[in-house]
A protein has these predicted regions:
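Short, polar loop/linker segments at the starts of domains and inter-domain junctions
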Residues: 19-29, 89, 128, 229-235
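Amphipathic alpha-helical segments that form well-ordered structural scaffolds
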Residues: 93-100, 187-194, 248-251
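Post-HExxH zinc-binding segment in Zn-dependent metallohydrolases
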Residues: 172-222
């Protein structure tokens, strides 16, 4: 795995040696608006509270802000609750992520439909089972780069990476859905800390330690909400399952410090500090990074 990590960091470093991504404001097409309307008005097992519909309805009433931007690798149709929230999105970083997944031979640009709902990922009260509304925040249609839907602001950068893998046909369909999701999430979180490190080994190792500790402490709590902590019941695929894979890869840092920094959070990545937020040009209130 060390060879793969070295390769990943080298790839990320080369990405940040390239010029910044140039975004331009555009008007969303009728096709894109119809897709967004259809998705927001369709029930989904991942969004049982239908946060998508609530936000779309508020958008139509004129109470929310829509921004559509395009670069050479894709476009983002973003719906924000406030104008100030626009400064929470790391535009250059998202563009670089799209560029790293983009395949020239395919020539299909990514389309990301981002509904920046501010609701946070939190554990349910007591020891109630964890449901999709506690933890999920996006989906896509497999092998379709034009259908990435993210409907929660918190941890949206990690969700973008997760869904890009599905959209690029990287799923091992020989595996069960739970295992595919666990593998995808394991890779998403590894890629996330790699790109935040900008390919710097020292920063990467520090983030790897923080992410490992966050994962382990969070999953100790997750198991208490499961009927059988050794099973693959929900949300094993996003939590215990991905930790198992990191452990198998030999990258899980098991050095745990005292204290509970997770508290009630079900955000899957360790929250970035203000230094990282400044580096990626987002305001300190940003949960999107």
């Amino acid at each position: 795995m060390s060879i793969l990590i070295d390769t990943l960091l080298d790839r990320v470093k080369k990405e940040f040696d390239k010029p910044p991504i140039q975004w331009e404001n555009i008007t969303p097409s009728k096709k894109d608006m119809n897709f967004l309307r259809q998705e927001c008005n369709t029930e989904s097992e991942f969004d049982k509270a239908n946060k998508r519909k609530v936000m779309f309805d508020e958008l139509i009433r004129g109470n929310l802000v829509m921004v559509t931007c395009k670069c050479n690798y894709g476009q983002v149709v973003a719906v924000f609750e406030t104008m100030e929230q626009m400064a929470e999105l790391p535009w250059d970083l998202w563009g670089r992520i799209l560029r790293m997944f983009y395949e020239k031979r395919n020539k299909t640009l990514f389309k990301v439909f981002f509904l920046a709902n501010k609701s946070l990922r939190v554990f349910p009260k007591g020891l109630k089972p964890i449901q999709t509304e506690n933890i999920n925040g996006g989906y896509t249609y497999r092998c379709n780069p034009e259908t990435i839907v993210i409907y929660r602001a918190e941890d949206a950068t990690r969700v973008l990476i997760h869904e890009l893998q599905h959209s690029c046909c990287l799923d091992n369909i020989a595996h069960s859905l739970d295992v595919v999701e666990a593998e995808t999430e394991a890779w998403a979180e590894l890629f996330y800390i790699a790109i935040l490190s900008q390919g710097n080994t020292r920063i990467f190792n520090n983030l790897l330690q923080k992410q490992s500790e966050w994962m382990i402490k969070q999953n100790r709590k997750v198991k208490k909400h499961m009927t059988n902590s050794e099973s693959t019941e929900f949300p094993w695929r996003y939590t215990v399952g991905k930790e198992k894979i990191w452990n198998e890869w030999g990258i899980l840092n098991k050095s745990i410090t005292p204290g509970d920094n997770v508290v009630r959070s079900l955000r899957l990545t360790y929250p970035p500090n203000n230094t990282l937020k400044e580096r990626f040009k987002v305001i300190k209130e940003s949960t999107i990074l």
